[in-house]
């Protein structure tokens, strides 16, 4: 039966890898006419701790190659008839839990120290990761006046904005599958210029990690054609809070000034 599972799974993965990587053990077993327990034993025979580890390995290899149409097909097969609110929010909670359980605390502390001690901080993210980069830039700018957001996806313009980067600086690159070439190239450029590199990405196998001195991993996945960035955003929240805790006096002074400015310019509605 294991042999049958091996042959059947190989055919299933080869012929429809984008769906097979997201099948449950039960669905994969049904697809190759074996039991769910046989699929689990099959994963163990391949050297994995169980089927979930095999599944994550498959996903990490193929998710950067999935087109938007294939992503929509995968989501339909995973969520099925579930209410989108229940299905999507449950998956997002699992992503945060997985990130929390696997985050490298030493790497996290190194990232905090590097940002605090840096002469200048450059942040870059493209496509949907650009939202993460903007979010991080917004809050770090409230703590430091040394933070620059690299805002273009054109490689030549990125290099122009980074022309003065060098030793003593830190470059923070954010990218998740499908990885943006502009961010990979920017990481390499900053690395070659002698800057410290912090990669915020989905795994140590990410193309950003090869240039990084510190890699922070957050579990990322797709929901239909939408990139689920819930776990990366949560990790950024933690990183920003940790950095602000190291600069408590500076942050308090900044917000006292901001509160005065906001009051004087009637920024927020108060009679709510």
Predicted regions and their residues:
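Glycine-rich phosphate-binding loops that contact phosphosugars or nucleotide phosphates
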Residues: 116-234, 238-247
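Glycine-rich phosphate/diphosphate-binding loops that line cofactor/substrate pockets in enzymes
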Residues: 106-118
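A short, charged, Gly/Pro-tolerant segment at domain boundaries
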Residues: 249-272
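HTH-adjacent hinge/linker in prokaryotic transcriptional regulators
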Residues: 17-22, 26, 30-33, 38-106
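Single conserved hydrophobic/aromatic residue that forms the stacking wall/gate
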Residues: 1-9
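Beta-strand-loop-alpha-helix segment that lines the small-molecule cofactor/substrate pocket
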Residues: 12
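Short, flexible, glycine/charge-rich loop motifs used to bind or transfer phosphoryl groups or to couple energy/partner
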Residues: 1-2, 18, 110-112, 159-163, ...
């Amino acid at each position: 039966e294991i042999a049958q599972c091996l042959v059947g799974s190989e055919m299933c993965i080869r012929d429809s890898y984008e769906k097979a990587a997201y099948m449950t053990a039960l669905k994969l077993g049904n697809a190759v006419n074996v039991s769910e327990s046989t699929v689990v034993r099959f994963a163990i025979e391949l050297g994995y701790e169980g089927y979930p580890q095999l599944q994550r390995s498959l996903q990490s290899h193929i998710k950067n190659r999935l087109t938007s149409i294939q992503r929509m097909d995968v989501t339909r097969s995973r969520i099925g008839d579930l209410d989108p609110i229940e299905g999507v929010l449950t998956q997002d909670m699992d992503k945060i839990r997985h990130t929390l359980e696997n985050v490298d605390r030493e790497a996290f502390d190194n990232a905090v120290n590097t940002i605090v001690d840096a002469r200048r901080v450059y942040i870059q993210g493209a496509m949907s990761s650009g939202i993460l980069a903007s979010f991080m830039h917004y809050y770090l700018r409230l703590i430091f006046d040394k933070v620059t957001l690299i805002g273009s996806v054109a490689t030549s313009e990125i290099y122009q904005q980074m022309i003065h980067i060098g030793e003593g600086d830190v470059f923070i690159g954010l990218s998740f599958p499908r990885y943006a070439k502009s961010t990979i190239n920017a990481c390499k450029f900053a690395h070659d210029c002698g800057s410290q590199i912090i990669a915020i990405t989905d795994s140590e196998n990410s193309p950003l990690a090869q240039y990084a001195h510190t890699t922070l991993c957050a579990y990322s996945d797709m929901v239909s054609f939408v990139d689920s960035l819930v776990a990366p955003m949560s990790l950024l929240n933690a990183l920003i809070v940790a950095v602000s805790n190291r600069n408590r006096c500076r942050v308090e002074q900044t917000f006292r000034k901001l509160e005065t400015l906001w009051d004087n310019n009637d920024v927020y509605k108060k009679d709510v």
